[in-house]
Amino acid sequence: MSDQIHYLETGSLDPAYNLAFEEVVLRRRTQGDYLLLWQNDNTVVVGQNQNAEAEIDRAFVEAHHIRVVRRTTGGGAVYHDLGNLNYSFITDSGEVQLLALERFTRPVVEALRGLGLQSEASGRNDILV
């Protein structure tokens, strides 16, 4: 793991673009650690192995023009809108025990605090604002 973290924003609200951007960074990046930030507009993101039909209310998402996309990683279904900021950490470290999540969340929390926002790292992978 290097001391430097490369910061990237997609600049897009399109969930398909944002997930593809994340995948491209993962596969084509040079060595180093990366922090990606993005927002999706009215989207349900389902995990790689989930049954999307079982996770969503099709009539509701269609009536409210909510997009449904699938990510290439596991985990549960989540709803994204412009009220939340999404982030990914991509690192060279293959050793889970060497990967301290605090190394990635600390700069984000400090930046938010620098903007005058009360924030803190919480749980395994959340930053509360």
Task: Map each language-model feature to its residues.
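Short beta-strand
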Residues: 35-39, 78, 118-121
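Active-site cofactor/substrate anionic-group-binding motifs, chiefly glycine-
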Residues: 53-77
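Residues forming anionic-ligand binding surfaces in small-molecule and nucleic-acid pockets
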Residues: 72-93
